[in-house]
Amino acid sequence: MVLNPRYQLDRRPLQGVPGDGWCGEKQMPDLIELNGRRYRKPQRPTVIICVDGCDPEYLDRGIPDGVFPTIGSFRRNGYFGRADAAMPTFTNPNNVSIVTGAPPSIHGIAGNYYLDRETGREVMMTDERLMLCETILALMAGAGIRTAAITAKDKLRKLLGRNLSGICFSSERASSEVEELVGRAKPDMYSADLSLFVLDAGIKLLERREGDLLYLSLSDYIQHAHAPGDPAADTFHRAIDDRVGRLVELGAVVGLVADHGMNDKALPDGAPNVIFLEDTLNKRFGADAVRVICPITDPFVRHHGALGSFVRVYASKAADLAALMAAGASIPGVALVLDGPEAARRFEMPVDREADFVVLGDANTAIGASRAEHDLSGLAGHRLRSHGGLGEQRVPFILSRPLTPEYRHLAETRRLRNFDIFDFALNGIR
């Protein structure tokens, strides 16, 4: 298949310091090595799917209701567990963690959005130059494995495609060649089909025998709008399950994880349950005492209005940091306040890119900056459902084939992370 160069990443030489430790990479006859882990080259087609926003409750309700016959069968025929996502529980840091097998402290991407302290500008974290290490995908492609990264959201394309010489494109901006491959026009960015298009593209690559290792990253449009058990959620998840079944029919090992869960963050009357933290702290401590950055911010504003349960707070030089943190912690709905170094240590985030302090909402509370900065009209009558905090850290961790005894023991005795999925899929199945 020939792809429009606009949707294929460059083929620059791999960068990094070879070695056995974090951020080193090696290539061996049947292995690659990255960030302290060795990965076997796939013995059969291997497909890792990040089901964006797939809170475990969708499976807990959907499997008994017959929504997930294929994925439900992995309880008997494969491995069916839970893992912890990286913090904060947003799309970019977790997708990059999954494809590097490492937390944000190693790869450098700790949000969708950050404040550049040197320039004072707020910046979208979509540039692969912000990444601090290579990806499993790039190293596998460099070792001769036919590798593809397909994402629903174009914001992830450059990050996932860092130094990747294989196929890399998004359904959001699919080229005419990709539309021809899949057999239909690219979907609307606010649709369930944005995700299904990704899965269908992956299926086509396997049917054509043009892929050995695929990473397929979906969109959480449906999960933001529809709770577990809602008809629209069930219809969407049945469609995902059908496509997972087809991948298995084609002989693939399938691994499924999520980048985060999802929780209702609305009041009983349906109004969003939001703390506008910048407004609150500046009212108490004076104008411009703080600047609040919402790292959930991305182009998909209709999903969440840039409201999640994790924010970064930058204090003015004249502000009393301890007093600001104490005031934030006293607000109902705030679950945790940590200074920047402690947040980086506890949540494995890069300390040099951290704020003065971070504030996390509880499972049912979103935190914003100022009311004027958040447009909630896109919710269009839906309850606010979002993510970012500790309440959305538990995610599915599923494999279509059973684990070896060694990896079964690991799964039972250590804390599983969503970014363990490539290790388990490539090294740990029977």
Where are these regions (language model features)?
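Low-complexity, glycine/alanine/valine/leucine- and proline-rich hydrophobic stretches
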Residues: 361-411, 415-423
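Short, structured active-site-proximal loop/turn typified by the sulfatase FGly-forming signature C/S-X-P-X-R
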Residues: 60-101, 148
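Active-site-proximal N-terminal segment of extracellular/periplasmic enzymes that hydrolyze or transfer
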Residues: 24-79
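His/Asp/Glu-rich, glycine-adjacent segments
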Residues: 4, 21, 99-227, 233, ...
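Beta-strand elements within well-structured catalytic alpha/beta cores of enzymes
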Residues: 43-59, 74, 98, 140, ...
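Low-complexity, intrinsically disordered or signal/transmembrane-proximal segments
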Residues: 7-8, 15, 27
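Secreted, luminal/periplasmic, and some membrane-associated catalytic domains
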Residues: 44, 51, 90, 114-127, ...
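A cross-taxon signal for low-complexity, glycine/charged-rich
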Residues: 1, 18-19
